[in-house]
From Swiss-Prot:
Catalytic activity: N-succinyl-L-glutamate 5-semialdehyde + NAD(+) + H2O = N-succinyl-L-glutamate + NADH + 2 H(+)
Record lineage: Bacteria, Pseudomonadati, Pseudomonadota, Gammaproteobacteria, Alteromonadales
Protein's organism: Shewanella baltica (strain OS223)
The protein, known as: N-succinylglutamate 5-semialdehyde dehydrogenase
Domain of life of the organism encoding this protein: Bacteria
Annotated TM spans: none
GO molecular function: succinylglutamate-semialdehyde dehydrogenase activity
Pathway: Amino-acid degradation; L-arginine degradation via AST pathway; L-glutamate and succinate from L-arginine: step 4/5
EC number of the protein: 1.2.1.71
Cross-referenced PANTHER family: ALDEHYDE DEHYDROGENASE-RELATED
Name of the gene encoding the protein in the UniProt record: astD
Gene3D superfamilies to which the protein is assigned, alphabetical: Aldehyde Dehydrogenase, Chain A, domain 1, Aldehyde Dehydrogenase, Chain A, domain 2
Length: 486
């Protein structure tokens, strides 16, 4: 059970791959990658199934998707544990991820009807009707940080709209993908409607470049997203939806309850071991005694964050990063910032060789003149002290990204001022910036995406509008155009 093509499970014909629990390096999944021929077979299966899937109609498609929701409910404990073991995230957090997957079904159905349903109006020219049709065959590339929820957020609306899908998950989370697709199979999804190909870069390239794709929906790094954007530049007929990362700012201004502010900072910067695309990377705190007090409390709170394996009891706030490589990357990022003039307030350390376990870090980068505009994808928060609000907003906007941003402030006037000037697709006030609603769009500007917001707006890129003017019979107009006689 590695690849799912035309409703059947197949062994891979490529090279050996394995998935390890990043908290203890135990191997939890093995398989072989999909070859280009197997990718072709998956695309062919999706193409053959697409028209019949569309012609079932929305209600019939929804019934199958709702059966999948029932499968998620029945298997939520196993799915949450699988996500925890493969990503290293604590069990409390993976349970919330599965809950989000279940909730996505109703939200996606509502979004389909609201964003891409059918509307008819009588006009003097005839009955004007707006309908929506699926693009056809689409690929979904999933990330490792939310290996269930984020690809689910593409797959469910794509299927509801009548598309067929080839799912290529992260090579770091193949077991989660296999379990997800097995639940779709149990839900009675017709053969070829959803196909799974596992693999690394070569598999991804074979799928992304396939001439029979009508679209590709991607969640992942800005680097890979930009590569896909370049690849699709000469194909205006294909829909490309990119959901990428961010170098996200959080500004603190005039907050009286600094304990509450510290809580929101911790939730913004360190949840999921900093491996959320919306995590705060840069923290802007006012100069002065109040800012000093907040930073002192924050540093103490960061030192007290509990870190541990996915199954530790009592449960930790932070689990493992996705791999030892990722952990070492964060140590290197911290060293680079220190070399540039940063001052460590709480040192990020690699806790155990061979694992992805790291402690959270806090570094004052105020003295760095040219702060690197990088998304350091882990639990390292960069602190900048500012003298006035306009300076803070200017610094916050000094990024090529534009995913999330936030303001913790007691003044509504300050928030309105901030909201009008900050450049980001997700802007929160007095809430953690990792908090997003599935009933709202999710996406950013700049290097964070290509204006294809997901979540509630995923329906928009899963179908295209068809405008019609209709009449029940062919009839001669009462008045002919000048120059015509009949």
């Amino acid at each position: 059970m590695t690849h799912y093509i035309q409703g059947q499970w197949h062994a891979g014909k490529g090279h050996d791959v394995a998935s390890m629990n990043p908290a203890n390096t135990h191997t939890i999944w093995t398989g072989k990658t999909a070859t280009a021929e197997q990718v072709n077979a998956a695309v062919d299966a999706a193409r053959a199934a697409q028209f019949d899937w569309f012609m079932l109609g929305f209600d019939a498609r929804l019934a199958i998707v709702e059966t999948y929701r029932s499968q998620l409910e029945a298997n939520k404990a196993e799915l949450a544990e699988t996500i925890a073991q493969e990503t290293g995230k604590p069990q409390w957090e993976t349970a919330t991820e599965v809950g989000a997957m279940i909730g996505k079904i109703a939200l996606s159905a509502a979004a389909y009807n609201k964003r891409t349903g059918t509307e008819a109006n009588d006009t003097p020219a005839g009955r004007a009707v707006i309908r929506h049709k699926p693009h056809g065959v689409v690929a979904v590339f999933g990330p490792y940080n939310f290996p269930g929820h984020l690809p689910n957020g593409h797959i469910v609306p794509a299927l509801l709209a009548g598309n067929t899908v080839i799912f290529k998950p992260s090579e770091l989370t193949p077991k989660v993908a296999e379990l997800m697709v097995s639940l779709w199979d149990k839900a009675g999804l017709p053969a070829g409607v959803l196909n799974l190909v596992q693999g690394e870069v070569d598999t991804g390239k074979a799928l992304a470049s396939h001439p029979q794709l009508d679209g590709l929906f991607f969640t992942g790094s800005s680097r890979t997203g930009h590569f896909l954007h370049q690849q699709y530049a000469g194909h205006p007929g294909k829909i490309l939806a990119l959901e990428m990362g961010g170098n996200n700012p959080l500004i603190i201004k005039g907050v009286q309850d600094i304990k509450a502010a510290v809580h929101d900072i911790l939730q913004s910067a360190y949840i999921s071991s900093g491996q959320r695309c919306t995590c705060a990377r840069r923290l802007y705190v006012e100069q002065g005694e109040q800012g000093d007090a907040l930073i002192a409390m924050l540093a103490d709170a960061v030192k007290q964050i509990k870190v541990g394996p996915w199954n530790s009891q009592p449960q930790p706030f932070m689990g493992s990063m996705i791999s030892e490589t990722a952990a070492k990357g964060m140590v290197a990022a911290q060293a680079n910032l220190l070399n540039l003039g940063g001052v460590s307030l709480v040192e990020l350390t690699h806790l155990e060789a061979g694992t992805g376990l790291v402690s959270p870090g806090l570094i004052d980068v105020t003295a760095i003149d040219a702060l690197p505009d990088e998304e350091y994808f882990g639990p390292l928060l960069q602190l900048v002290r500012y003298s006035d609000f306009d300076q803070a907003i200017k610094l916050a906007n000094q990024t090529r990204y534009g995913l999330s941003a936030g303001l913790l402030a007691d003044s509504r006037e300050d928030y309105d001022y901030f909201l009008a000037r900050i450049r980001a697709g997700i802007v929160n006030w007095n809430k953690q910036i990792t908090g997003a609603s599935g009933a709202a769009p999710f996406g950013g500007v700049g290097a964070s995406g290509n204006h294809r917001a997901s979540a509630f707006y995923a329906a928009d890129y899963c179908a295209y509008p068809v405008a019609s003017v209709e009449a029940d019979t062919v009839s001669l107009p009462a008045t002919l155009s000048p120059g015509l006689s009949l």
